[in-house]
């Protein structure tokens, strides 16, 4: 049986992390669930431990730093990465992972934008930013990736162990896509459901400052890769 690891980068997700873990216990009971806690000031780590996750602290702030540690530390045949905010159903994430398990993709993408994202997401500037990033990446790389910034992906071991993580923050989503496009790695997408954050759960993404970093990252990576 192939080894599957569920990777959940977390920063202050006390309200939602239990739902995420239990959802995967139900739909993918054979998987190991790793919660990397990125200096949370709430009880994210405690709740994750209580629900059976493997909890690892990551002291360098930023999602990119968390992903770097995850990819370095964890050995598996297939890796599923989801945000800890309970916006991605585990049932759909398993379908994304199946594309990797079947050998159809090195990176599989859960495409929110072709599904419920624009009706569920209540942050209009996030919607605009997603469209802008998608258009720019596809123009530069002559590609047709539908959801560049999704927080639900699956990876092969080959992808994970060959990916040089350069970004420290949320730009990591863009970097993963650019890496796959530049190296001509097989990418597959499948539409998935997306649900908005529950009341009281706050997005850590700053639309303007993080959006600016993403744009800078796109041009930096284009220069370095090309």
For each predicted feature, which ranges?
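Donor nucleotide-sugar binding loop of glycosyltransferases
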Residues: 13-16, 40, 63
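Hydrophobic helical membrane-anchoring modules
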Residues: 1, 140-143, 165-226
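Cell-envelope/extracellular polymer assembly enzymes that use nucleotide-activated donors
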Residues: 3-5, 32, 175
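Active-site acidic Asp-centered loop
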Residues: 38, 82-84
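Short, well-formed alpha-helical segments that are part of the catalytic scaffolds
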Residues: 12-26
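Acceptor/aglycone-binding surface of glycosyltransferases and processive sugar-polymer synthases
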Residues: 59-73, 90-170, 196-212
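Short aromatic/hydrophobic "clamp" motif used to bind/position activated sugar donors
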Residues: 79
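A conserved acidic beta->alpha catalytic loop
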Residues: 37-45
């Amino acid at each position: 049986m192939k080894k599957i690891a569920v990777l959940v980068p977390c920063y202050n997700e006390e309200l939602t992390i239990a739902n995420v873990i239990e959802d995967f216990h139900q739909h993918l009971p054979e998987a190991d669930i790793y919660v990397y806690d990125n200096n949370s000031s709430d009880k994210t780590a405690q709740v994750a431990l209580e629900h059976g996750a493997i909890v690892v602290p990551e002291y360098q702030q930023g999602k990119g730093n968390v992903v770097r540690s995850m990819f370095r530390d964890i050995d598996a045949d297939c890796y599923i990465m989801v945000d800890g905010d309970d916006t991605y159903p585990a049932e759909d994430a398993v379908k994304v992972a199946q594309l990797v398990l079947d050998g159809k993709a090195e990176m599989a993408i859960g495409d929110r934008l072709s599904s419920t994202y624009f009706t569920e997401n209540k942050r209009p500037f996030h919607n605009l930013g997603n469209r802008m990033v998608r258009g720019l990446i596809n123009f530069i790389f002559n590609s047709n990736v539908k959801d560049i910034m999704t927080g639900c992906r699956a990876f092969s071991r080959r992808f994970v162990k060959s990916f040089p993580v350069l970004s420290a923050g949320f730009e990591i989503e863009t970097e993963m896509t650019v890496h796959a496009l530049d190296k001509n790695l097989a990418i597959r997408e499948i539409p998935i459901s997306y649900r908005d954050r529950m009341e009281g759960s706050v997005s850590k993404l700053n639309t303007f400052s993080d959006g600016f970093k993403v744009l800078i990252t796109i041009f930096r990576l284009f220069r370095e890769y090309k």
